[in-house]
């Protein structure tokens, strides 16, 4: 027999069989969106197959046979109200007591009150229904997998457990307080634990007594209550016997016709508590509890069995056992405390209950729903199925339990006032993802390049980025903008080691890396990436990748590698790939104009004019005509090779086939400049302007340099001053046309700031052109004009300093050097660097070389001291010779400044400087200072330098001095050494030996 039941998906669906066995398991653990799940089931106790259908769009649950056409499965309105009412009731109850004391307990109840067990769970289905509803309360989600494994027991074990649960009583309590009434009033009073009284008092105070509906039961419901009361009476009697052994002062009096009572000492707080409970009890229920004739018989049987149970409990209390033995596993009750909390509840707590049918179909519904769910989960191979994009939301894979994939509650069945923490967060927006990627790029850019691999992986994974082809490409792009090409290669290596990362368009990532490496001028690394692309069919280069690597190699001048790339384009893959669906896949390509232009760029760097004719031949074979850009590059190749006649020839060919561009005119102007034809260069630019071709700034810059090198500085400056005002005037006209008069000043200032740097570069180029041509005066004139327009930078000042010194204008050079040195004293913040220039190493070396060459030792000393003051160190290879010459010329302060500088920096002076200082001290008669300088360096000089302080070396030095001076020196050295044992190879030891040999030689000669 099969029953098809449709109900709200928030509860469960059921299939009922004749044995009425039930098995419970949560049905919906995780939200499915816009999907339909159909599972075929083979019932164990049914011959016919059933189909379990979950339509998650409409939240319908149904059971159909395979022969049915559609899933026409909708819950009835009464069933829907019934389930929703139970769910809302469960949500309001946050705490439940383990044991509910009857209405008359405590001494204040009515003797003829009608008792009824309201929420006793006879079947496993209804007992689990309470847990199921509590599980979907306000702050609880189904997560207890241990309960689910226990709930997989069959129906017989479930019924046996419920029966044993009815016999189980509170094992931790030291006393029982019960009040029974059979014909009159019979009471049993037992002292109970203080914690139990406080908890029970708090629960009784918060009980609700104004429920609007009663419980209507049919004849089958009365029979069910009979079984419940029989088992209750047995348990209470057993508890009473047990308490009898623990309390020696219990006096039990029984009366068959009148009043029978069992009296025990009672605590005062216990009486106050029951008095308070009776005060809050509700006795004005709006509707009674309708029962049939069998209900009256039930009350008689219940009361008789309750008295027997109490007597049994009193006898049982004689034993010393503190716990009540039960047949059920104690671990199950400890793991399921919420199920043991709800035992009994008064009829007076609710005026109106849940309407049930005569056959108790609510219990059967839940039991069969659990059983069907268990069968569905056992037969549905969820591991082999692949989750779709929408099903994957919120799924958490667990190899031990497939149910972990559905560990979240369906949001559609949550109440509006409940928390939505379980619902997946919305997808990250594109802007937010871009911000995360850029932040990660900055973190990686600032980190150490030699950071460990685990630390790099941690930084990558902690960015909260879902790594796809697009996100990795953007990460490489941001790293390229920051100029960190090493980190780009590290990111690619990290991706190659990730087994979980499956890229569909890895070619795009490699191509982006090629672009970054090309902009960073890293041709070798780009070629390595290109070789890596050839190893996989998914990353095999396309035309975009070939263009990128060709441009990179062409700018670097690697012609051989560039021809290798061209051969790779035209040939099939050398590696044999696995056969794919692309049977006719052919990666062979022909070079296009971009690749050929890259070859011309390489020829410019290598100055190989033969490559230009090879490009023309290849274009002719393909039937293509050279573009203006190609002609311009060919002319540039001929200019680099100094074949000026070919430049003019190709320019004439370009005029016949197409209109020359600004690049071609620039190459032509540079050619005329090299030939010394400045007038023709001017006419060429005028012809370009007459044709309506807009020249670039580089063109006018080259023309201005041509004029300045020819001595026509005014015309060159006019050319420079002509370009910028024209641009500013055009921008100003555009602003007026756009009716944005109020933004004119702001835009003009912005344009001036943008044009500031190119203007400095332009003037610097003009000065360099004049210096190269030998026109120092013109260079000085342009330098003075430049100060009126913009502030010269360090490069401009160094060029002019060298020009002054080469042109014999030493005074002008000294003034410029002094101005640059004094600017360092007036810098207080970063904005001062824009208008002031500080000298660098090139500035000091240029000034020192010129002063030493012209033997201007005073200026040399000033420049040398300024160099040390600005933080630049003494360079022995460059400065030692000049320092020794200055010392011999009488500028000993230069040598002393060098000695002090090296002492502060813990550096050992070179041996020529040590000897020179020693000689100067001996000449002045300061033997103590001379010996002290050697003693301080004794033991610190390297072995390679000790050769300069050998005995023979000192002998050559001492030959310059008189005998009396050497004798005095020997005495001072002996006093310095004293009793200390100096090795024969030490500096002072060698000096002493040399002095003795020198004196012996002089004495022998005399």
UniProtKB/Swiss-Prot annotation:
Q: Which GO terms describe its molecular function?
A: mRNA binding
GO BP term (any one):
chloroplast organization
InterPro entries with a match to the protein in the record: DG1/EMB2279-like, Pentatricopeptide_rpt, TPR-like_helical_dom_sf
Family indicated by similarity? Belongs to the PPR family. P subfamily.
Name assigned to this protein: Pentatricopeptide repeat-containing protein At1g30610, chloroplastic
**GO cellular component term of the entry, any:** chloroplast
Q: Where in the cell is it found?
A: Plastid, Chloroplast
SUPFAM superfamilies named among the record's database cross-references: TPR-like (SSF48452)
Q: Where is the composition biased (Polar residues)?
A: 254-263
User: Where does the record place its PPR repeats?
Assistant: 468-502, 506-536, 542-572, 592-626, 627-657, 661-695, 759-789, 793-827, 840-874, 875-909
Q: Where is this region: Disordered?
A: 180-219, 248-292
Q: Where is the transit peptide?
A: 1-40
Question: Which UniProt keywords are given for this protein, alphabetically ordered?
Answer: Chloroplast, Plastid, Repeat, Transit peptide
Compositional bias (Basic and acidic residues) at which positions?
A: 194-219, 265-284
Coiled coil regions in record:
none
Q: Summarize the protein's role.
A: May play a role in embryogenesis.
């Amino acid at each position: 027999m099969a029953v098809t039941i449709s109900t709200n998906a928030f509860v469960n669906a059921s299939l009922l069989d004749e044995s009425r066995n039930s098995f419970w398991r949560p049905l919906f653990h995780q939200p499915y969106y816009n999907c339909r799940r159909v599972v075929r089931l083979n019932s164990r106790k049914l011959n016919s197959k059933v189909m379990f259908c979950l339509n998650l769009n409409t939240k319908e649950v149904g059971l159909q046979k395979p022969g049915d056409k559609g899933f026409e499965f909708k819950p009835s309105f009464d069933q829907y109200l019934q389930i929703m009412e139970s769910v809302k009731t469960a949500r309001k109850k946050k705490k439940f007591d383990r044991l509910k004391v009857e209405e008359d307990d405590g001494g204040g109840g009515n003797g003829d009150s009608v008792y009824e067990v309201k929420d006793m769970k006879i079947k496993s289905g209804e007992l689990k229904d309470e847990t199921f509803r509590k599980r979907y309360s306000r702050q609880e989600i189904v997560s207890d997998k241990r309960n689910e494994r226990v709930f997989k027991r069959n129906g017989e074990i479930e019924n046996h457990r419920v029966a044993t649960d009815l016999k189980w009583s509170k094992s931790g309590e030291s006393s029982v307080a019960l009040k029974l009434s059979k014909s009159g009033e019979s009471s049993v009073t037992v002292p109970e634990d203080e914690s139990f009284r406080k908890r029970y008092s708090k629960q009784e105070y918060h009980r609700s007594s104004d429920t609007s509906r009663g419980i209507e039961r049919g004849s089958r419901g009365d029979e069910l209550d009979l079984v419940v009361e029989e088992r209750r009476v047995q348990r209470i009697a057993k508890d009473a016997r047990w308490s009898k052994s623990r309390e020696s002062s219990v006096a039990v009096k029984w009366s068959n016709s009148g009043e029978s009572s069992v009296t025990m000492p009672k605590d005062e707080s216990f009486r106050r508590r029951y008095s308070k409970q009776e005060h809050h009890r509700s006795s004005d229920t709006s509707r009674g509890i309708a029962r049939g004739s069998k209900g009256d018989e039930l009350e008689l049987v219940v009361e008789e069995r309750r008295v027997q149970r109490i007597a049994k409990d009193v006898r049982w209390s004689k034993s010393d056992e503190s716990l009540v033995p039960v047949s059920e596993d104690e671990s199950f009750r400890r793991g399921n405390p919420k199920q043991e909390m709800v035992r009994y509840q008064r009829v007076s707590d609710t005026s109106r209950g849940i309407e049930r049918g005569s056959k108790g179909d609510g219990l059967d519904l839940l039991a069969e729903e659990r059983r069907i769910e268990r069968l569905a989960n056992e037969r549905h191979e969820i591991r082999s199925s692949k989750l779709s994009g929408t099903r994957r939301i919120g799924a958490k894979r667990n190899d031990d339990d497939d149910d972990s994939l559905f560990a979240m509650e369906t949001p559609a069945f949550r109440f509006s006032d409940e928390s939505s923490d379980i619902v997946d967060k919305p997808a990250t927006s594109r802007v937010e993802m871009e911000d995360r990627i850029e932040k990660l790029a900055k973190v990686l850019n600032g980190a150490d390049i030699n950071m460990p691999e685990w630390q790099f992986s941690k930084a990558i994974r902690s960015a909260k980025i879902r790594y796809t082809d697009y996100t990795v490409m953007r990460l490489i792009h941001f790293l390229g903008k920051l100029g960190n090409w090493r980190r780009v290669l590290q990111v690619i290596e990290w991706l190659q080691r990730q087994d979980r990362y499956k890229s569909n368009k890895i070619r795009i990532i490699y191509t982006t890396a090629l672009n970054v490496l090309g902009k960073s001028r890293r041709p070798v690394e780009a070629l390595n990436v290109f070789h890596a692309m050839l190893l996989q069919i998914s990353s095999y280069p396309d035309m975009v990748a070939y263009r990128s690597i060709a441009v990179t190699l062409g700018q670097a001048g690697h012609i051989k590698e560039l021809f290798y790339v061209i051969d790779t384009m035209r040939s099939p893959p050398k590696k044999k790939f696995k056969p794919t669906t692309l049977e006719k896949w052919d990666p062979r390509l022909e070079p296009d104009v971009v690749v050929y232009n890259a070859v011309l760029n390489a020829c410019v760097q290598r100055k190989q004019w033969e490559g230009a004719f090879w490009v023309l031949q290849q274009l002719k074979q393909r039937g293509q005509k050279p573009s203006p850009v190609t002609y311009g590059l060919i002319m540039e190749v001929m200019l680099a090779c100094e074949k000026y006649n070919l430049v003019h020839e190709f320019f004439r060919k370009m005029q016949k086939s197409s209109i020359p561009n600004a690049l071609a005119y620039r190459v032509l102007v540079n050619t005329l400049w090299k030939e010394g034809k400045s007038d023709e260069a001017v006419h060429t630019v005028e012809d370009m302007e007459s044709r309506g071709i807009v020249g670039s700034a580089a063109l006018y810059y080259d023309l201005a340099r041509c004029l300045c090198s020819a001595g026509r500085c005014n015309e060159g400056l006019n050319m420079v001053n002509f370009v910028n005002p024209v641009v500013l005037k055009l921008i100003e006209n555009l602003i007026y046309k756009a009716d944005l008069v109020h933004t004119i000043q702001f835009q003009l200032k912005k344009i001036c700031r943008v044009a500031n740097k190119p203007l400095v570069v332009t003037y610097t180029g003009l000065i360099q052109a004049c210096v190269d041509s030998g026109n120092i005066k013109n260079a000085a004139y342009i330098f003075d004009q430049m100060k009126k327009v913009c502030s010269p930078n360090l490069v401009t000042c160094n060029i002019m300093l060298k020009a002054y010194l080469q042109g014999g204008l030493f005074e002008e050079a000294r003034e410029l050097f002094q101005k640059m040195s004094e600017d360092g004293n007036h810098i207080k913040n970063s904005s001062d660097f824009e208008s002031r220039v500080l000298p660098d190493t090139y500035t000091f070396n240029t000034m020192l070389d010129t002063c030493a060459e012209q033997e201007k030792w005073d200026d040399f000393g000033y420049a040398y001291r300024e160099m040390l003051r600005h933080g630049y160190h003494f360079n022995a290879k460059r400065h030692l010779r000049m320092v020794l010459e200055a010392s011999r010329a009488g500028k000993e302060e230069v040598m002393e400044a060098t000695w002090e500088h090296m002492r502060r920096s813990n550096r050992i002076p070179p041996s020529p400087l040590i000897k020179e200082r020693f000689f100067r001290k001996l000449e002045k008669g300061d033997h103590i200072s001379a010996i002290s300088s050697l003693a301080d360096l004794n033991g610190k000089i390297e072995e390679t330098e000790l050769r300069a302080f050998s005995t023979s070396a000192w002998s050559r030095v001492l030959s310059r001095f008189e005998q009396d001076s050497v004798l005095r020196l020997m005495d001072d050295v002996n006093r310095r050494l004293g009793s200390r044992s100096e090795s024969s190879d030490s500096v002072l030891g060698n000096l002493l030996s040399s002095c003795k040999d020198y004196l012996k030689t002089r004495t022998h000669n005399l």
